[in-house]
């Protein structure tokens, strides 16, 4: 586990974005952990997120020409990632995002920021069903831009109704690689290193039941 991944977990726990206990998910499953990126709402959090997303993207090796953030949670992530790439990686890339409702005045339309062109990295917090990402892929196709990678905060590595996770299904159906800052393996490694064997074992049992790998 890289230092930025451990720091991401530490920040998420300190901000209560990552919690351990018993949480009933929308699926009805009772999970031993819960991740809510909406809790990362401080200026220091968004700066940290930008650095982590930028590092994950750079480490992935996928060449990109611009950053795109799907409305709404992806909007600050796109800006923060673009800032971190410029400040820490000497890569000054344009960014854009979409609105959920089109404007009929001012600049109009659903797209804001730089024109969609070249190889585009899409940044979002998590992928649940993949619906929002598919909408973005359609926008890129219309603009004749190429999706280079999708970067998310956490990959739960959890299957849906079938044997695949939403991320696996998305990668298989679109061919677009998904990069995550952390996944379930990193959380378990962090807990074991911290000496919290009990929580790590609960997550391992949950993964045995619902894991996608």
From Swiss-Prot:
Annotated residues for binding of 5-phospho-alpha-D-ribose 1-diphosphate: 26, 72-73, 99-100, 103, 105, 124-132
Domain of life: Bacteria
Pfam families registered for this protein in UniProt: Pribosyltran
Binding site for orotate: 34-35, 128, 156
Metabolic or biological pathway: Pyrimidine metabolism; UMP biosynthesis via de novo pathway; UMP from orotate: step 1/2
The keyword Nucleotide-binding belongs to this UniProt entry's keyword annotation: no
EC class (word): transferase
Any Gene Ontology biological process: 'de novo' UMP biosynthetic process
The keyword Magnesium is assigned to this record: yes
Gene Ontology cellular component terms for the protein in this record: cytoplasm
Cofactors, names only: Mg(2+)
UniProt KW keywords: Glycosyltransferase, Magnesium, Pyrimidine biosynthesis, Transferase
InterPro entries per record: OPRT (IPR023031), Or_phspho_trans_dom (IPR004467), PRibTrfase_dom (IPR000836), PRTase-like (IPR029057)
Gene Ontology MF terms: magnesium ion binding; orotate phosphoribosyltransferase activity
Annotated catalysed reactions: orotidine 5'-phosphate + diphosphate = orotate + 5-phospho-alpha-D-ribose 1-diphosphate
Enzyme Commission code(s) on record: 2.4.2.10
Secretion signal span: none
Database matches in HAMAP family: PyrE (MF_01208)
Purpose: Catalyzes the transfer of a ribosyl phosphate group from 5-phosphoribose 1-diphosphate to orotate, leading to the formation of orotidine monophosphate (OMP).
Sequence similarity: Belongs to the purine/pyrimidine phosphoribosyltransferase family. PyrE subfamily.
Subunit structure: Homodimer.
Identification of the protein by name: Orotate phosphoribosyltransferase
